[in-house]
Structure formats: C-alpha cells, structure tokens
C-alpha cells in the first residue's frame, strides 16, 4: 500500500513539474502607430491621426502576435508618447520592447482580358511593410526589417452571364497580412532571445508592485 501511495505521489509531483515547465513566460510589448508612407488615400481631407491603411497594418500585427501566445500586448497609438516613454518612464508601464512600423508601398492593379465568348478581370494588390523593434529601456533600435506581400483575385464573365465585379476590398487586408506574416517569426525571435525580466512599478508601505 505504501508503495502505491509513493508511486501516486511521485506521479503527481511529475505532472505538476511538467505543467509548470510547460508555461510560457511572455514578453511585454508595446505596439506603436503604423504610419502610412505611401500616397494611397492621401486626398484633400486626409487625416494623419486616423489613417485607415496604417490602422489595418497595426491591427493585423497585433492579432498575429497575440495568436503566437508569447506576448502581453500593450497598444500605444501615440508615436510621440512612445518616444518619450523610453528609459525610466517606460518602467511605469513595464514594457520590454516597442514595435514601430510603416506601410511603405501600396498599389492596386486591374487587368482585363477579352475573348470571343468570355471576359476576365484580374485584381491585384501589392503592399510593403517595414518594422523597427526598440529596446524600451535603452531606446536603441535592436532590429529592423521589411517585407512585401501580394493578393489577387480573378473574375470571369461568359457570354453576358455574370456581373461586372467591383474592387475586392479584402485584398488590401490580405496583401498587408502576407507582408506582415513574413516578419512575425523574426519579431518573435528577437523579442524572446534575451532573459525575461520585470520592473518594480512602485513601493507602497514596504510592499513591492512589479510588472508581470
């Protein structure tokens, strides 16, 4: 009986140890604004603070990093505030890294082909994205990279059957997502290749409050 109890106890300890080792230590990352460095969408009433292309890229990157399960994400939409928060002030929010990005290229292309009994239309979107990873404590850029992505669709009309296809708005998301997907693995590697650390946020009545 004692041997059985000893075996069960050892088994429970092993399972507990395995569960603890299986936990992932997450890095705290602040994502800054993605700027739109292209001419796309910059008309008379263009609002730099609410650029839809930059917001698309930011949302896609945030989603992909969240899906990795390796980060606690802190979204910081004000680039000037991000720059001011390096060093001692950055400890207050406890971020390890800042990720800043830009949409550097964006273009749409429509191509059509007419045949005797059919017409076809090819819609293509190409996008370029660049990112920078900044050490939140030192303010130094530790990594930068860029990538391009493309998405397309083809519609056909046979002898008057089928409507004229308008522009597929989802292609913008798909092209930007394709570009960002090429960068995500390197972002994860660069942000996790250093030992995990935490910050003391405040001391109150002899108790320490630290970032998790």
Residue spans for each PLM region:
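Positively charged n-region of N-terminal signal peptides that target proteins for export
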Residues: 1-4
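Residue-level preference for long, well-ordered alpha-helices that form the structural scaffold
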Residues: 50-54, 123, 168, 172, ...
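Short, solvent-exposed, polar/charged sequence segments at loop or secondary-structure edges
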Residues: 49-53, 59-60, 66-122
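Bacterial N-terminal signal peptides
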Residues: 6-14
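Amphipathic beta-strand/beta-sheet edge segments enriched in Tyr/Trp
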Residues: 96-157
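Short, structured interface segments
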Residues: 169-195
């Amino acid at each position: 009986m004692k041997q059985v109890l000893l075996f069960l106890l050892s088994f429970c300890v092993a399972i507990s140890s395995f569960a603890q080792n299986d936990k992932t230590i997450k890095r705290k990352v602040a994502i800054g604004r993605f700027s739109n460095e292209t001419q796309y969408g910059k008309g008379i009433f263009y609002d730099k603070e609410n650029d839809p292309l930059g917001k698309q890229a930011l949302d896609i990157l945030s989603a992909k990093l969240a899906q990795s399960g390796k980060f606690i994400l802190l979204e910081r939409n004000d680039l000037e505030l991000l720059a001011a928060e390096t060093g001692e002030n950055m400890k207050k929010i406890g971020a390890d890294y800042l990720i800043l990005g830009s949409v550097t290229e964006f273009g749409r292309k429509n191509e059509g082909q007419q045949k005797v009994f059919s017409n076809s239309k090819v819609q293509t979107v190409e996008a370029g994205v660049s990112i920078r990873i900044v050490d939140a404590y030192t303010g130094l850029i530790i990594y930068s990279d860029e990538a391009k992505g493309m998405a397309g669709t083809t519609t056909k009309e046979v002898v008057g059957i089928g409507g004229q296809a308008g522009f597929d708005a989802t292609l913008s998301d798909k092209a930007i997502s394709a570009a960002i997907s090429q960068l995500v693995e390197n972002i994860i590697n660069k942000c996790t290749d250093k030992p995990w650390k935490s910050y003391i946020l405040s001391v109150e009545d002899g108790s320490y409050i630290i970032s998790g």
